[in-house]
């Protein structure tokens, strides 16, 4: 539940390495009170107060994706494709999907199926290297040049459904402790899938930790996740002292 509430509060935010998220100069500062009220309402009521109607689907820019979906630039030697039930189900996820290219790149980046889909993708480019990528939805086709697609650091331009934290007793390595859950859906076939993208970033860990700390100080709401992250942070061998909150109040 704490993770769900945290994700709800983060939907309005864009991670930044330089600008404090809730600084007075921040675009999001004026939304802070509404965001806090919505999350507090969700903790006390069965009917949460939402800032945006839930029936409105996200609006995507087809030419802008997050860096999570950027396919590898180095091609691997083509090998056989394993046609499994999951692979066939993924084809139904792609068929006539309005977000066909975004879904394809997500499947290529999926740690569990990337080898198969990367073979498929590289094989297609080997056969037709000059046409780029062509997507077809209900006989309406469009060509893309991968090098002209814009990849941004804001992960929330994609349909992020949640975050996972794998906090273990082993603090010698920070590898793959954060995972982004990407929700894929094909309204044409009704097929859905959630893909977990591991993301190894201490900067992102600090950003989320500070967002939670600020929210706790501002509202008094307790988070088990915050306690676990602070406990984990204090055990990291390369942290000489507990960092102070990075987000300014003024």
From Swiss-Prot:
The heterodimer glycoprotein H-glycoprotein L is required for the fusion of viral and plasma membranes leading to virus entry into the host cell. Acts as a functional inhibitor of gH and maintains gH in an inhibited form. Upon binding to host integrins, gL dissociates from gH leading to activation of the viral fusion glycoproteins gB and gH. This is Envelope glycoprotein L. It is a peripheral membrane protein. Disulfide bonds join 136-141. It comes from Human herpesvirus 6B (strain Z29). The keyword Cell inner membrane does not apply. Residues 1-18 form the signal peptide. InterPro entries: Cytomegalo_gL (IPR002689).
């Amino acid at each position: 539940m704490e993770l769900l509430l945290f994700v709800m509060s983060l939907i309005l935010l864009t991670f930044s390495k330089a600008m404090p998220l809730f600084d007075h100069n921040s675009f999001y500062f004026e939304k802070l009170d509404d965001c806090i009220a919505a999350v507090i309402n969700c903790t006390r009521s069965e009917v949460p107060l939402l800032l945006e109607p839930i029936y409105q689907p996200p609006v995507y820019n087809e030419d802008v994706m997050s860096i999570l979906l950027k396919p590898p630039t180095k091609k691997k030697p083509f090998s056989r494709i394993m046609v499994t039930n999951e692979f066939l189900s993924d084809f139904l996820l792609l068929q006539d999907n309005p977000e066909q290219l975004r879904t394809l790149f997500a499947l290529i980046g999926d740690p569990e199926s990337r080898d198969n889909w990367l073979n498929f993708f590289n094989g297609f480019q080997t056969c037709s290297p000059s046409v780029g990528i062509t997507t077809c939805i209900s006989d309406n086709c469009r060509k893309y040049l991968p090098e002209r697609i814009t990849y941004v650091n804001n992960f929330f331009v994609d349909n992020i459904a949640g975050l996972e934290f794998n906090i273990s007793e082993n603090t010698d390595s920070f590898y793959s402790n954060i995972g982004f859950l990407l929700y894929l859906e094909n309204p044409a076939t009704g097929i859905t899938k959630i893909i977990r993208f591991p993301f190894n970033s201490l900067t992102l860990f600090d950003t989320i930790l500070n967002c939670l700390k600020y929210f706790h100080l501002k509202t008094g709401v307790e988070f088990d996740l915050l306690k676990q992250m602070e406990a984990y942070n204090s055990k990291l061998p390369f942290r000489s002292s507990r960092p102070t909150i990075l987000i300014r109040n003024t």
